[in-house]
């Protein structure tokens, strides 16, 4: 039987505020047994010591555990992305899937988890291959082939002082001893893993470390986010399949730089969300289920020839600058601030740019966004 995906975009008052999800469970909009993934933008710093992410995971486990059983919690991918700089609004994206009759094509969703990653493998080819295997497993679960995939969301681990120390104690050498740098290395390897699984980057082009890989080789349909709250990888694949039904559709674009909105506008236009003035209008916003994007400060320190200071600010990490900057540009286009914009786009789109995915309801389709 075909399957049907649903998405609820819900507000949060704090990282541990699951009241909106709980209300959706009570009123029947959401069946706990159908939930396959929960994404969130939490109001931490998005760096190594952002504990809003594990706090949110703890709250989710406390909500769903009594409903589906502790043993079943592992089948829900909990992808927390810290950082709501600028006007970004903290929010939840709850993704569910169930059997349902009806015509396709429609949004298809699959998720998978990898084994735990050894600290010494982070940022190296072993991590790339591990994530590639996870992406392939999620594609199989969704019934998608590489050409049908529009976006892959990966949550990957980072290195802490304790994890580095444990690796050194057993005679292993991590790729870095810098915990903040480890986030970028992990995101890079995760993105290359997705690109490998999707056929965007050949295996021969990937070095033994991400530093040995040409940055011109990058994923075009992946967003990777690193966090302290896990040791493995959570992988969620989204695409369009004739074997899925329902009102949801997905499309994607790639921004060439931080202000490159034309591809995003074209994507929104293909989904019928733009008004006559070229911006998402009220009717389009009612149909917008989710927007996911990656943001990165360009390595050359400039945007279209004009200098930026995101890389030279000693007070604020460049990922935080980029997240707020790109989110503002996208929010102006769509007229909404509860967008899943994630900083740190290593090997995710071209330098300074990044992939964007838009999920929408077909015109005339009812349902909460």
From Swiss-Prot:
Catalyzed reactions per annotation: cyanurate + H2O = 1-carboxybiuret + H(+)
UniProt keywords, alphabetically: Hydrolase, Magnesium, Metal-binding
Binding site for Mg(2+): 296, 345, 348-350, 353
GO biological process, any: atrazine catabolic process
Active site, renumbered: 155, 225
Stretches for region RU A: 1-100
InterPro entries: AtzD/Barbiturase (IPR014086), AtzD/Barbiturase_RUA (IPR043008), AtzD/Barbiturase_RUB (IPR043006), AtzD/Barbiturase_RUC (IPR043007)
Involved pathway(s): Xenobiotic degradation; atrazine degradation; biuret from cyanurate: step 1/1
Region span, RU C: 248-369
Protein residues bound to substrate: 53, 81-82, 187, 225-226, 323, 342-343
EC class of the enzyme, as a word: hydrolase
Site (Important for substrate specificity): 319
Molecular function terms, GO-annotated: cyanuric acid amidohydrolase activity; metal ion binding
Superkingdom of the source species: Bacteria
Ranges for region RU B: 106-242
Entries under Pfam families matching the protein: Amido_AtzD_TrzD
Enzyme Commission number, as recorded: 3.5.2.15
Known regulation of activity: Inhibited by barbituric acid.
Entry note about domains: The monomer structure is formed from three repeating units (RUs) that share the same structure as one another. The monomer, the active site and substrate all possess threefold rotational symmetry, to the extent that the active site possesses three potential Ser-Lys catalytic dyads. It is possible that any or all of the three active-site serines may act as nucleophile (albeit only one can do so per catalytic cycle).
Assembly and interaction partners: Homotetramer.
Function: Responsible for the hydrolysis of cyanuric acid, an intermediate formed during catabolism of s-triazine based compounds in herbicides such as atrazine and polymers such as melamine. Catalyzes the hydrolytic opening of the s-triazine ring of cyanuric acid (2,4,6-trihydroxy-s-triazine) to yield carbon dioxide and carboxybiuret, which spontaneously decarboxylates to biuret.
Family affiliation: Belongs to the cyclic amide hydrolase (CyAH) family.
Protein name (record): Cyanuric acid amidohydrolase
């Amino acid at each position: 039987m075909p399957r049907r995906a649903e998405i609820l975009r819900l507000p949060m008052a704090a990282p541990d505020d699951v009241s909106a999800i709980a209300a959706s469970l009570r009123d029947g909009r959401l069946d706990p047994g159908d939930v396959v993934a929960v994404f969130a933008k939490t109001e931490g710093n998005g760096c190594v010591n952002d504990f809003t992410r594990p706090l949110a995971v703890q709250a989710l486990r406390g909500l769903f555990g009594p409903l589906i059983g502790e043993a079943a919690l592992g089948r829900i991918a909990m992808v927390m992305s810290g950082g709501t700089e600028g006007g970004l609004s903290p929010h939840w994206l709850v993704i569910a899937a169930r059997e349902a009759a009806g015509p396709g094509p429609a949004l298809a969703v699959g998720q998978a988890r990898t084994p735990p990653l050894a600290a010494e493998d982070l940022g190296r080819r072993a991590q790339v291959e591990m994530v590639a295997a996870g992406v392939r497993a999620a594609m199989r679960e969704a019934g998608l082939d590489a050409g049908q995939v529009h976006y892959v969301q990966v949550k990957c681990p980072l290195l802490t002082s304790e994890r580095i120390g444990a690796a050194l104690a057993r005679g292993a050498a991590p790729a870095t001893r810098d915990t903040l740098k480890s986030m970028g290395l992990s995101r890079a390897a995760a993105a290359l893993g997705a690109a490998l699984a999707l056929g965007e980057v050949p295996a021969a082009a990937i070095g033994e470390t991400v530093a040995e890989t040409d940055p011109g080789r990058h994923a075009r349909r992946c967003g990777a986010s690193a966090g302290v709250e896990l040791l493995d990888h959570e992988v969620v694949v989204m695409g369009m399949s004739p074997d899925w039904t329902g009102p949801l559709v997905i499309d994607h674009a790639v921004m060439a730089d931080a202000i490159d909105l034309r591809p995003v506008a074209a994507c929104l236009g293909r989904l019928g969300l733009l008004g006559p003035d070229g911006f998402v209008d009220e009717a389009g916003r009612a149909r917008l289920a989710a927007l996911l994007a990656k943001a990165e400060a360009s390595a050359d320190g400039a945007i279209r020839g004009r200098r930026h200071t995101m890389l030279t600010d000693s007070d604020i990490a460049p990922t935080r600058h980029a997240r707020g900057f790109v989110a503002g540009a996208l929010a102006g286009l769509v007229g909404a601030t509860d967008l899943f914009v994630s900083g740190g786009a290593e090997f995710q789109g071209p330098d300074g740019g990044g992939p964007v995915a838009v999920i929408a309801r077909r015109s005339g389709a009812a349902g909460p966004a």
